[in-house]
Amino acid sequence: MDFLNDIKVYDNVLDQSAITEVFEFLSRNFYTLARTNDTDALERSKKFLRLKRTEEELQEFKKEFLQQQMADAIRDKDLKAEKLYWTRIHKGAPECTQEDELLCAALYEGLANVCDLPPYEALGNVYTNMLRTMDRPTAHIDNIDPKNRTVMFYTNAVWHRDWGGETIFYDLDDNIIKAVQPKPGRVVSFDGRIPHSGRPPVTSAYVPRYITVMKF
């Protein structure tokens, strides 16, 4: 399970001026409610990842996973508040604006200064999740395909160690293997097969925790 060790943290990817500008953009924009991650889906993915799989098995699992997501979407209108979270899509959706595209380009440029990246055109989707005190995020796996990668920007202008908001990474037995504090300008890049979850900010933060995510 070498992929569980593939977690890289980069600090000061954005300077304070840039991160403040990004935060101001994110904090004044509109967010929509989306369905939170499904615990059963996580358990199915973990079971699949425990064994070595063929390419055919991988593609079949991805197909079944997508079909389940589509079935779940039909029932989304009946979800209670604790099963929802706030998100904004910046790339890959009709509602994206020119400002969203400028944000994506700026974040990509900053990241390119600290690590090797695929071409910008290979960037799949970009979105920001807003996590508030009392929200109930659940652990999940982004993608079981070994060719994928998740990059997470911490986009609050200010954050204190006592405010919570960490990203927690787990092994396949639910043991915590790493916790990453959401310091402004920090980026964590990881194999999307690693189970992880966000921690909500504690009451003393008085602000939501923002993360902007790129999927490659």
Show the residue positions of the predicted features.
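Non-heme Fe(II)/2-oxoglutarate
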Residues: 1-117
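Catalytic core of non-heme Fe(II) oxygenases with the double-stranded beta-helix
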Residues: 108, 112-216
